[in-house]
């Protein structure tokens, strides 16, 4: 059988481009193999790597990145779907070149947390427990919803809070939840959950900076209340 007609799935697994990328990284693949992973399938006459090799003989990478869908469809074996896939990949690459990451938001006080979170939580009909994961400069790395529903120790487990903290290499955590009643006064359950998480953070070397309870136009800081030490 001609090499160009051998299907990729007929190759030994260790020779397939996708499996090699996973094992050895994308830099280990040729341009044709990388493009083949994007297109996934070839044509009746040739496998995807043979097709991509032929495409790259007609266009170099720069030319390919500038070709529109109509131009790409002039290549034998390239229909609308494959042309769109190629155009989409290069458009993403162009957008990456001009991408500017927004500066991370810094938290300096409980009021900063309230200002950030109140618009997101004021219309909530159920209690929502959110964690803010911070770096060493108190800049937000990630915001994550941990639970929805009445706050209690069985729902908000330290494992759920600190799993993301460890994955994000967070230096500290701020916890936030709302009281749909509008009264931000902490319940006994709020205090128990806070104390449990503070102790868990100490074991892992991750500081719990505060637990903010948001009500109707006001908030309570459990650190200011003396429950976060």
UniProtKB/Swiss-Prot annotation:
Keyword Protease part of the UniProt annotation: yes
List, alphabetically, the Gene3D superfamilies matched: Cytidine Deaminase, domain 2 (3.40.140.10)
Q: From the record, which residues define motif JAMM motif?
A: 177-190
Q: Which GO terms describe its molecular function?
A: metal ion binding; metallopeptidase activity
Please report the stretch or stretches of sequence annotated as the MPN domain.
Answer: 106-228
Instruction: Identify the residues that bind Zn(2+).
Output: 177, 179, 190
SUPFAM superfamilies to which the protein is assigned, alphabetical: RuvA domain 2-like
Q: Which family does it belong to?
A: Belongs to the UPF0758 family.
Its protein name is: UPF0758 protein MM_2791
């Amino acid at each position: 059988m001609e090499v160009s007609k051998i299907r990729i799935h007929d190759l030994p697994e260790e020779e397939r481009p996708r499996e090699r990328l996973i094992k050895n990284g994308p830099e280990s693949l040729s341009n044709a193999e990388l493009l083949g992973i994007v297109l996934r399938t070839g044509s009746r006459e040739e496998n995807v790597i043979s097709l991509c090799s032929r495409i790259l003989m007609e266009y170099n990478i720069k030319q390919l990145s500038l070709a529109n869908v109509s131009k790409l469809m002039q290549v034998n074996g390239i229909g609308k779907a494959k042309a769109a896939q190629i155009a989409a990949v290069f458009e993403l690459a162009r957008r990456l070149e001009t991408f500017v990451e927004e500066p991370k938001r810094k938290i300096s006080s409980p009021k900063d947390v309230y200002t950030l979170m109140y618009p997101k939580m004021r219309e909530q009909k159920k209690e929502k427990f959110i964690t803010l994961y911070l770096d060493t400069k108190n800049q937000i790395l990630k915001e994550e919803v941990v639970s929805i529903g009445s706050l209690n120790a069985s729902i908000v487990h330290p494992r759920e809070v600190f799993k993301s903290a460890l994955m994000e290499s967070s230096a500290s955590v701020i916890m936030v939840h709302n009281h749909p009643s509008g009264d931000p006064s902490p319940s006994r359950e709020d205090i128990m959950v806070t104390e449990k998480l503070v102790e868990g953070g100490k074991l892992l070397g991750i500081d719990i900076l505060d637990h903010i309870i948001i009500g109707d136009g006001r908030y309570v800081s459990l650190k200011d209340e003396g429950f976060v030490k």
